Each structure stands twice: as structure tokens, then as C-alpha cells.
């Protein structure tokens, strides 16, 4: 019985050692592959469409404001048949940005008082 326990402990030790060696080898190969892919990567970012400019050519190209991305909103002008699309910021997001800005300013004042 003691011999069986000894062999099982030895087997588990060798198995864990060999598996960690295989994982380390796999990690180093994967890391080298990732580095080579990152070196060959090219920048694909295109210019964004500013607020209140036409976004009908690409509805997902609106720029980001400080916290949120602007939304391409389409509408028909009064008396017109053509659809007009512009990048706009929804009002609820505008109010959220204002509230966040005021909270930052208030936090700065508190830091001055107690900091």
C-alpha cells in the first residue's frame, strides 16, 4: 500500500511538471505570434464626423464628446422631400455630461477644503 501511494505521488509530481512545461512553451509561442501580429497591424481608424455635420454617408462615424458618442439623427426638413442626417447629442446625454462636469468641479472644491 505504501508503494502504491509513493508511485501515485511520484506520478502526480511528474505529470504536473510536464504539463507546466508544455503550458510555458505554448505561452511563449503565443506571445511571439501576438508580437509579430501587432508589428504588422496597420491603423484603420477613419476620421469622425463632427457634431451637426452631415453623416448620411456613414451613420456610425459620429465623433465622441467627453463621455458619450454622438448619434446620427435623420429627419425630413419642413417642406422638403430629402432626408437630412446630422450628428447630434441626445438631450439626456447632454444633461448627464453637465452633471458629471459639475460633480468633478464640486469634488475639486472639496479636495481643496479638506485636502
Swiss-Prot record:
The signal peptide annotation in the UniProt record is 1-22
UniProt-annotated location(s) = Secreted
Where is it mostly found? secreted
Q: Which InterPro entries match?
A: Spider_toxin_CSTX_knottin (IPR019553), Spider_toxin_CSTX_Knottin_CS (IPR011142)
Which keywords fit this entry according to its UniProt record?
Disulfide bond, Secreted, Signal, Toxin
Q: In which tissues is it expressed?
A: Expressed by the venom gland.
- Which GO cellular component terms are attached? extracellular region
Family named by the database record? Belongs to the neurotoxin 19 (CSTX) family. 01 subfamily.
- Keyword Signal assigned: yes
- Provide the propeptide boundaries: 23-44
Domain comment, as recorded: The presence of a 'disulfide through disulfide knot' structurally defines this protein as a knottin.
For this entry, the protein name equals Toxin-like structure LSTX-D1
Task: Give the species this sequence originates from.
Answer: Lycosa singoriensis (Wolf spider)
